[in-house]
Regions:
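Solvent-exposed loop/turn segments connecting transmembrane beta-strands
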Residues: 63-66, 86-93, 197-200, 226-231
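N-terminal leader/targeting segments and the immediate start of mature chains
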Residues: 21-67, 259-261
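Gly/Pro-enriched, hydrophobic low-complexity segments
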Residues: 152-261
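An acidic-aromatic
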Residues: 80-134
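Sec-dependent bacterial lipoprotein signal peptides
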Residues: 1-21
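Hydrophobic, well-structured mid-protein blocks that either form specific transmembrane helices
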Residues: 123-163
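Edge/loop elements at the starts and ends of beta-strands within beta-rich repeat scaffolds
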Residues: 44-52, 64-67, 74-76, 96, ...
C-alpha cells in the first residue's frame, strides 16, 4: 500500500494547483492594491483556468519513506484529476482518477485497483491533521479560494518587502491562514496554516514562476506537513493550460483485481 499512500499524498497537493495561479504583470506595471482589489483579482483570475496538464518530478521525505518519481497530471475543472506515475524509460507504474467524492487508483505492475470514497476521515488517517478536504487542498497548493471572503476584509492585511500578506483567523477552530502574494507576479509565494499557540501545521513555498498564456505558474513547489513530519517537493518540466482538446481516457482492464478501500 506504500505506492497508494505516496499517490494520495502527492495528488492532494497537485489537485488544486490551478486554483493558485493568477496573471502576472511586468515590474514596471505593478501597483499597490487595496485588500479588496487584491482579493477580487485573485478570485477572478483563479476562475480563468479551465484545465491543466503538467509533467515533472516529485520527491517525498518522511519518517516512513524517502522516494520520488516522474509524473503526469491532468486536471479538469471543477473537480477531477488524472494522475500517472512513470518509471524508467517512461513506463507507467500507476494511474489514478480522482474527484472530490471518489478515487480509483490502479497499480499497473500488480494489475490491482483500489477505489473508494474520499472523506475527511481518510484524510485525517493519512495526514494526522483535522482539516476538511477543501482546507487541506488549499493549504498544500497555496490556492486562495476567496469566494467566501469577497465581501469581507481579511483579519490582517499588510505589505512586507515585495509581498502582500493576507491573514485569516478562524477563532472557532483556532486556526490561522497566512498567504504571501508577490506584488509583481500576483502569485502565492508562501502559505502557512497555524493552529493554537501559533504552531505551524502546514507550510508551502512556491517559486520559479513562469508566464503561460498570461498566467504565472510556480514550477517549483515545496510543501511541509509538520504534523506528520512530511515534505514533498514538486518540480515541473512542462505545463500547458486551457487546451480544448485535453481529455482523460482512463479505463481499468477487464481482468484487474478491484479492492474497495
Amino acid at each position: 500500500m506504500k505506492l497508494l499512500d505516496k499517490f494520495l499524498f502527492a495528488v492532494f497537493i497537485l489537485f488544486f494547483l490551478l486554483e493558485g495561479c493568477v496573471p502576472s504583470k511586468p515590474t514596471e506595471e505593478a501597483e499597490i492594491l487595496s485588500s479588496e482589489r487584491l482579493i477580487n483579482k485573485l478570485e477572478a483570475n483563479r476562475r480563468k483556468i479551465k484545465n491543466f496538464e503538467g509533467v515533472g518530478t516529485f520527491d517525498i521525505q518522511s519518517e516512513q519513506f524517502n522516494d520520488g518519481a516522474t509524473f503526469q497530471v491532468i486536471m479538469q475543472k471543477p473537480d477531477s484529476i488524472y494522475f500517472s506515475v512513470l518509471g524508467p524509460f517512461g513506463i507507467e507504474l500507476a494511474q489514478a482518477l480522482v474527484t472530490k467524492d471518489n478515487y480509483i487508483f490502479y497499480d499497473i505492475l500488480h494489475n490491482t485497483a483500489y477505489r473508494g470514497n474520499l472523506n475527511d476521515d481518510i484524510l485525517q488517517n493519512i495526514f494526522k491533521i483535522d482539516l476538511s478536504f477543501s482546507d487541506l487542498l488549499d493549504a498544500f497548493v497555496g490556492s486562495v479560494n476567496l469566494t467566501s471572503n469577497l465581501y469581507k476584509e481579511p483579519s490582517n492585511y499588510s505589505i512586507e518587502g515585495e509581498n502582500y500578506v493576507l491573514t485569516y483567523l478562524d477563532k472557532e477552530r483556532q486556526l490561522t491562514w497566512v498567504y504571501r502574494v508577490g506584488i509583481r507576479e500576483l502569485g502565492i509565494t508562501n502559505f502557512t496554516l497555524k493552529s493554537q499557540n501559533n504552531q505551524i501545521n502546514i507550510e508551502g513555498d512556491y517559486s520559479n514562476f513562469e508566464l503561460i498564456d498570461n498566467v504565472a505558474f510556480p514550477f517549483k513547489i515545496e510543501v511541509m506537513n509538520k504534523v506528520k513530519n512530511q515534505k514533498i517537493t514538486i518540480n515541473y518540466k512542462n505545463i500547458s493550460i486551457n487546451d480544448k482538446r485535453l481529455r482523460v481516457n482512463f479505463e481499468l482492464p477487464d481482468d484487474a483485481n478491484i479492492i474497495e478501500w
